[in-house]
């Protein structure tokens, strides 16, 4: 049926390692030419990091314009999130940035910016959902807002990514562009007479997903 938008992990790209690295490794393991990988996520991310500096489509001016601005990559202290975050750090470093990694409890936040071991970082990427920060760490949410307002640091996955991360964006898109070939019919209620999938607004990695049959019965 063609490509469909199922969700947009704008805030927490937790399938990045599988999509960018493991898929390529499987192709290589099975003697497929690596050029046949279906995506160029790794290379595209590298170029997008460079565009933070060039501020245009072309990345040829990166070396000329880059003045040593640093990116701090941070996650919770679990292996899966750390692996994904360190992959992003690796790509940014390969792009030409000065980078560092720290677990979130090692990062120093103040109205003056984002620090690790006393070093100020101009950019921050945090693999921690904004909704978790808002609910569980309200003071940090306020502080990060002050940091951005004071232009002391740029958060690479800013708070507005929460809107795109929500499954609710799929309903909005369907209402704006009904029957678009890249969209699936989406509603905040079960689709009458149709088999459908129920997802929470902020579900993670398939958690709390249910399959509803056309007769309304939940089969999974």
Predicted region positions:
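Conserved metal-phosphate-binding beta-hairpin within the catalytic cores
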Residues: 1-12
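Domain-scale recognition of functional cores that engage charged ligands
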Residues: 15-18, 23-220
């Amino acid at each position: 049926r063609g490509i469909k938008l199922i969700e947009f992990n704008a805030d927490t790209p937790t399938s990045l390692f599988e999509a960018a690295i493991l898929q390529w490794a499987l192709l290589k393991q099975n003697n497929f030419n690596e050029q046949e990988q279906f995506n160029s996520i790794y290379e595209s991310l590298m170029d997008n990091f460079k565009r933070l500096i060039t501020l245009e489509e072309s990345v040829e001016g990166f070396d000329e314009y880059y003045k040593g601005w640093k990116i701090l990559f941070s996650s919770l202290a679990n292996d899966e999130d750390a692996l994904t975050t360190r992959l992003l750090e690796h790509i940014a470093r390969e792009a030409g940035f000065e980078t560092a990694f720290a677990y979130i409890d090692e990062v120093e936040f103040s109205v003056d910016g984002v620090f690790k071991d006393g070093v100020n970082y101009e950019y921050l990427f945090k693999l921690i959902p904004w909704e978790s920060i808002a609910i569980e760490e309200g003071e940090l949410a306020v502080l990060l807002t002050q940091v951005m307002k004071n232009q002391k640091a740029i958060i690479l996955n800013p708070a507005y990514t929460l809107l795109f991360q929500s499954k609710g964006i799929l309903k909005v898109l369907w209402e704006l562009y009904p029957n678009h070939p890249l969209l699936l019919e989406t509603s905040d209620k079960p689709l009458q007479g149709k088999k459908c999938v129920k997802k929470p607004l902020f579900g993670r990695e398939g958690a709390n997903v249910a399959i509803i049959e056309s007769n309304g019965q939940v089969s999974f």
